[in-house]
Amino acid sequence: MTRLTYTLLIVNLAAFALETQLGDTQLAALLLWPVGPHFRPWQLLTSAFLHANPLHLATNMFGLWMFGRPVERAVGSLRFAELYGAGLATAGVTQLVVASLLTDKVPTLGASGALFGVLAAFAILFPNRIIVLLFPPIPMKAWVFVLLYGLFELISGVGGLQPGIAHFAHLGGLFGGVLMAAYWRREYQELLV
C-alpha cells in the first residue's frame, strides 16, 4: 500500500490550488527565502509544497508517483515519511547555505528536493531496475540514471546553467536520500549479525 505517496500527491495538488488564491504577500511568506529579513524557519517546510506553475507541479508529482510508490512499498510508510522529510530538510538547508554565498537573494519553492531524496533511495533499493527516459527514450539502470542526473545537477549548478532552478537544493535532497538509505542498510546489516 502506498498511502503516503498518494497523500503527498493530494496535499501538493491542494497546496497548488490554494497557492493560486493567495496574494503575493501571503505567498511570499511561504517561499524559502535566503537567511535575512524575509526568512522564517517554517519556510523550509511550506516552500516544499508550493510550485511555480502547473508544469513544475506536474513533473514533480509524476516523479513522486513513479518513484515514490515502489520505495514506499519497499520500506513502509513510516520510513518513506522519514526519507521524504530527510530529502526536504537537506535540500532546504543546502539551498540556504548556497544562497548565503550568492549575491542574488531570490526565494525557492518546490518538492524537487524531497523528490531527489526519494530518487536516491530508489536507485539504492532498485539499482538494476530499468528506467526509460521520456525524451529521448533511452533505457538505463536506475543507479546510472541517478548518477547521471546528479552529475547534470552539479554541472548545471556550478556552471550557472538553467538559472531559476535550485540545482544545489536538488543535490542536497539527493544527499539526504543517500544518508537515509545508508542508515537503513546499516540497520539491516546489524539485524543479520
Features from the language model and the residues they span:
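A detector for small-residue-rich transmembrane helices and their helix-helix packing motifs
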Residues: M1-V193
